[in-house]
Each structure stands twice: as C-alpha cells, then as structure tokens.
Amino acid sequence: MDLNEMRARYEREEGYSCLNATARVCQDVILSKLAASGMRDRVTVKGGVLMCALSGSGRRATQDIDLDFARYPMTDASIRSFVSALSNLGDGVTVRIAGEIEELSQQDYKGRRVNLKVSDGRSTFDTKLDLGVHASAAMEQDELWFDVAHRQEGVCLLANSKEQVFAEKLKSLLRHGIRTAPETRFMERFMENPPNLATVQSLLDWGGREPSRQGQLTGGYSCLDLEPLENLRGVLSQIDI
C-alpha cells in the first residue's frame, strides 16, 4: 500500500479535501488490517464508518474510527496488543500508538481513545481510534462489506446490527437532533426498510431519564413505545432538527 497514492486518488477521483482523504486512507488501512488479523471476530465496527456503510454515502465527514471489543479486555496492555496485531501483518504498513491511551467518558458512552501513527515507510498519517466494549456480547453481530480503496472486493467485518445502530442513534437524536447527512440518510433508509422494532425497543435502556432541550418529548425515554411503526414516525416528528 502506498498511502500518498491512496490519498491522492481520493482527492483526484472523489473530490476529497486533503484532511478527509487522509482520514479515509487511515480507515481503509485499519479496516483491511482488522479483516486480515486474528482479531476480526473479537471486534465490531460502529460509529461514523458503519453509518456511512449502511447509508451508502462516502466517509468524507468521518475522521475517527469507532470499534467495540467483544470478548476482549479493555486494558492498556490488551489495547497495545491489539494495535501490535494490526501492525505486524507483513503488508508494508505499520501502526503504532502515539502518546498515552486516553479515557473517554460522555453522557452515554465510556471507552478509550488511541492516537495512531500509520506509516508505509515513506509517509506517516495520523488518526484516532475510539474503543468501547460491546454492551451485549450475547447478541449476534452482522457481517458487512466495507469499501476500501486498494481492494476491489472490499473487506467483510463484524458490525453492530441495524437494530443496535438505530437504538443508539435514536438516543442521540432525542438528545441532540440530526446533525449530519449520513444520519439523515440512515433515518430515511430505516423508515423505508425498518428492522425489527421489538428488538430496537429491547435495546433501549433509558431508565426514565429526561431528554435534552432539543427534541423535547413528554416524559422520560423509557415511556417510548416503538410498536407499531406509526409510533416511531411520531417520535421522529417531534425531534427538533
């Protein structure tokens, strides 16, 4: 892999900015390495990379890489071992951790952030890897194909199910509203071809917490009834976007 050539191709053929092309190349490298490594079945793809794959849009606005560990510990030593496994594949591209592994703690997410250096020996690109622990190890994950620049057939990886993605996204939308084009496209596709709403409902664990000022609803999140589909349309219609 030639990182500079991959970036130039995204700039030339897809119209990416240098910043977005660099981020996309790093994502392609990490996804490819993950698919080729022994860690493939212990990691699920989530976040913006997954949203773009599900919505069919390019990853122009997605800068970081979000992954969840499943049946794998979230210690510093384990994270370093994971990155080392991605680096030592003999494909001419190395991945190393730069600086300290950071703690991430937000309203509905806890995890670790790893700053990475991706190098082919000629060029070195920076990216960020956000790691979490999969909330339900017993829940079956989907297999999904991701487009990568240097592989015509793409790579197949485990990813959060459509129900899981929607449950997490619905929580976020109720708090913050729709903020990105991939989110909008995903919601539109969901309404055209919805997953199992009973499964989505079972994944919602809001405990009666009040929504934010944006997207005001009466009562706590736990009162929401997503069956039938018309109820969900009503919920979405009340989100302030």
Describe every region a protein language model picked out:
Residues 1-43, 52-61, 65, 69-241:
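Structured mid-to-C-terminal alpha-helical surface segments
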